[in-house]
Amino acid sequence: MLTKRQVKILQTIVEEFIKTNQPVGSKRILELLDIKISSATIRNESAILEHEGYLEKQHTSSGRTPSTKGYRYYVDNIMKLDSADYTRLKIYLNQLLDLRKYDIDKTINYASEIISELTKMTAVVIKKQNIKNIKLKKIELILLSEFLASVLFIFSDGDVQNKMFNLKDISLSDLKIAIKLFSDFLVDVKLDEIDQYLNDLKHQLSLSIKQYDYVLNTFINTILESKNEQKETHGMRYMLENPEFNDTNKLKNAVKLVEQLSPFDWFNIAYESNKNMNKIAIKIGNEIDQINDDISMIATELKIGNSSTVLTLVGPKRVDYNQVNQLMNLIIEIINAKEN
């Protein structure tokens, strides 16, 4: 359990680092704190916070930066909604949107563009129609040539979707195994219940074939995107502008994450907010995966009539969580008002 003084120091470091992207030293903390405290005490408390995993020491400077654990503590225990800021942002957003001009879908898309611009984060909007009565009925493999195969997904409403596979990228035997496992787990399952089976399916795939992640994402994308899944992405350019992604490999991993996550993944991120009785889900650093420790995701699910839409913001771990949280709450409020 952190003391009040440690909480204050952690808050100061998080908020200053978000603003400056520079490690925060004891001298700067002393300037920012509104309590009387010595530099020696700040250094001692910062060392304790580092030892407990809330801060990280930067070897190139005397300052410290927040860790994933530090950001998580800030989001869960320190961050508060500022009513004055919220009101100001609400007026600004309503003026920009001019709600009379747009239907709900256009309002969400335009709002996501605005939020992307305000936060300098990438916005991903996934819309899912009501598919509760549609089932996957059959998966078939058609070998077209020595190097090309087609997988057909047949649905209870008569729809058939086709996905081509280059057999240089995945072996025919692995493809056959994947089809068998998908058929065993998902045939005659309603599409809106597929997520209940995916963890077990993924486990079996991982034991049976090499490229199980690729196959899982490709198959699920084909199944769900074919049933009126709509995806809009705004502000990918902001990935290039954030210094966290100056490293080419980190940038590639971030872009790959945004492009390859299946609709199920996006909804699963937002689902956690409903499970925890919160409107907004926040994932930070290695809570997403080990490769993308510099990334954060903030998501909310908007239920509109018979459809659901997930709005997710993706950016560096060093984002203004308070501002993003307020903007996401505003979108929820605006969409609810629009629908009613």
Swiss-Prot record:
<comment type="similarity">
    <text>Belongs to the HrcA family.</text>
</comment>
<dbReference type="InterPro" id="IPR023120">
    <property type="entry name" value="WHTH_transcript_rep_HrcA_IDD"/>
</dbReference>
<keyword id="KW-0346">Stress response</keyword>
<dbReference type="GO" id="GO:0045892">
    <property type="term" value="P:negative regulation of DNA-templated transcription"/>
</dbReference>
<dbReference type="InterPro" id="IPR036390">
    <property type="entry name" value="WH_DNA-bd_sf"/>
</dbReference>
<keyword id="KW-0678">Repressor</keyword>
<keyword id="KW-0804">Transcription</keyword>
<dbReference type="InterPro" id="IPR002571">
    <property type="entry name" value="HrcA"/>
</dbReference>
<dbReference type="GO" id="GO:0003677">
    <property type="term" value="F:DNA binding"/>
</dbReference>
<dbReference type="InterPro" id="IPR021153">
    <property type="entry name" value="HrcA_C"/>
</dbReference>
<dbReference type="InterPro" id="IPR029016">
    <property type="entry name" value="GAF-like_dom_sf"/>
</dbReference>
<comment type="function">
    <text>Negative regulator of class I heat shock genes (grpE-dnaK-dnaJ and groELS operons). Prevents heat-shock induction of these operons.</text>
</comment>
<dbReference type="InterPro" id="IPR036388">
    <property type="entry name" value="WH-like_DNA-bd_sf"/>
</dbReference>
<dbReference type="Pfam" id="PF01628">
    <property type="entry name" value="HrcA"/>
</dbReference>
<protein>
    <recommendedName>
        <fullName>Heat-inducible transcription repressor HrcA</fullName>
    </recommendedName>
</protein>
<keyword id="KW-0805">Transcription regulation</keyword>
